[in-house]
């Protein structure tokens, strides 16, 4: 997750001279260096185009761009993609400078800060709770009768249905990268994590057909 910080440059210009000492970004301080503790996140499966493909061994879901470490807190790279259904999650690591994906072997474990994990319940659709019934409007006594009610333009146009999104999943960026396929496209299986290509959610939720 990346945030763009608009530094509002160009507004100060000439003002900056007389108001010296105000520079720098100030405010938030971001954590530098490794975290205080790390937990197991994934096991190495194979390398692909310079990235590491892992099988998750954690019950939680990692943040995108979260830093991945070895057990001794040496940086390996960042989480790039999340793939597969919720009960069998895979993810890829974009290697840091100087780290080679081919240098690892099957079963090698990778670690993550516990602060960079989300509970899987965050991605499971919650059942809708029925609210209290709406009170009926009372007709005003006397006066001119209503205009007959126009029917609301065809009953809310038939409920277009979403754009094929993965209900409760990330709809990640994986897909046809020579080995990542097969875990579902954008809008793949319900509650899963999509790939980086694939059909866009079943041609966008039934957009075609004849127009009348």
UniProtKB/Swiss-Prot annotation:
It is found in: Nucleus, Nucleolus. Keywords: Nucleus, Repeat, Ribonucleoprotein, Ribosome biogenesis, RNA-binding, rRNA processing. GO terms for cellular component: box H/ACA snoRNP complex. Pfam families: Gar1. Residues 7-27, 143-206 have a biased composition (Gly residues). Residues 145-209 are annotated as: RGG-box 2. The keyword Plastid does not apply. The keyword rRNA-binding does not apply. InterPro entries: Gar1/Naf1_Cbf5-bd_sf, H/ACA_rnp_Gar1/Naf1, Transl_B-barrel_sf. GO terms for molecular function: box H/ACA snoRNA binding. Residues 8-27 are annotated as: RGG-box 1. GO terms for biological process: snoRNA guided rRNA pseudouridine synthesis; snRNA pseudouridine synthesis. It comes from the Eukaryota. Component of the small nucleolar ribonucleoprotein particles containing H/ACA-type snoRNAs (H/ACA snoRNPs). Belongs to the GAR1 family. This is H/ACA ribonucleoprotein complex subunit GAR1. The gene is GAR1.
